[in-house]
Amino acid sequence: MASFRRFRLLSPLKPCVTFGRMLYTRIDKDGLTMLAGHLAYVSLLSLVPLITVIFALFAAFPMFAEISIKLKAFIFANFIPATGDIIQNYLEQFVANSNRMTVVGTCGLIVTALLLIYSVDSVLNIIWRSKIQRSLVFSFAVYWMVLTLGPILVGASMVISSYLLSLHWLAHARVDSMIDEILRVFPLLISWVSFWLLYSVVPTVRVPARDALIGALVAALLFELGKKGFAMYITLFPSYQLIYGVLAVIPILFLWVYWSWCIVLLGAEITVTLGEYRAERHHAKSVITQSPEM
C-alpha cells in the first residue's frame, strides 16, 4: 500500500525528471559553459563597437537625442548590476575617442559589431543542430538590419512612451500608480520579448512559438534573479575590489557577461529540449498503441 502511494506521488514528477535528464544531457553534450565563454569573449571585444554604432545611429536622428540619454540610463540601471555607473563612464570615454577615427577605422568598428551578431547566430544554430546555412548576402542583410533597425525601433518606442506619459489624463493618481507598476516589470518584459525573438528568428529551423515563449520566460526570470543575485554578491563579497582595486571593473564585467550568456543559452537549450521531449512522448505513445496489434 505504501509503495502504491509512493508511486502515485512520484508519477506526476516523472515527466519533470525525464525532461530534466534530457536537458542536462543536452547541456553537457553541447558544452554550454564553453559556448557561453566564447560569446562572453566576443561580447567584450564587440561591446564598444556595438555601442558606438548604436548611439551613432541615434545621433543621426535629432529627435532621438534626449531619448538616447534615457536609453543609456535605462540599460545600465536594469541590465548591468552593480558598478554600472563606472562601466558607463568608461564606455562613454571609449565611444568619445572612437568619434575621431577614420573611415577605415569606422568600417572596422562596424565589422567588429557584426561579429557579435554572427557569433550568436552560429552558437544558437549549434544548439539547434541545424545544418541549414543562410547565404552570405542574406546573413549580412539580416545582421545589418538588426544592427540598424533594432536601436531605431527601441528609440521610437521610448519616444511614444514619453509622449503617452506626458498626456494630462495620465496624471491621475490611480493611473500613475499603475504606470509605476508597469515600469517596474518593464525590464522583465523587454528581456522576455528579446529572448523570444532570439530563439524564434535566429535558428535556421522552425521553432514552435510556445516552446520559444517558455524558454524565453525562464531565461528572462533567471536574468532578473541573476541580476539581483550578482549585485548582492558584489556588494557582500567585494573580493574583486580588494584584489584588483581600480581594475576590478574588468573581471566584474566579464563575469556578468559570461553569466548572462549562460542564462541565454540555457533558455535556448530549454526551448530545444521541449520539442525533443514532446517528440519522444509522441513516439512512446505510438509504440504503445501499436503493440497490441503486433
UniProtKB/Swiss-Prot annotation:
Lineage: superkingdom: Bacteria
Chain segments annotated as coiled-coil in the UniProt record: none
Major subcellular site: membrane
One of the Pfam families matching this protein, by short name: Virul_fac_BrkB
Membrane topology, record value: Multi-pass membrane protein
Recorded GO CC terms: plasma membrane
The keyword Metal-binding belongs to this UniProt entry's keyword annotation: no
Transmembrane stretches, start-end: 44-64, 67-87, 108-128, 136-156, 185-205, 212-232, 246-266
Locations listed in the record: Cell inner membrane
Record-stated family: Belongs to the UPF0761 family.
Name of protein: UPF0761 membrane protein YPTS_0028
Upper taxonomic lineage: Bacteria, Pseudomonadati, Pseudomonadota, Gammaproteobacteria, Enterobacterales
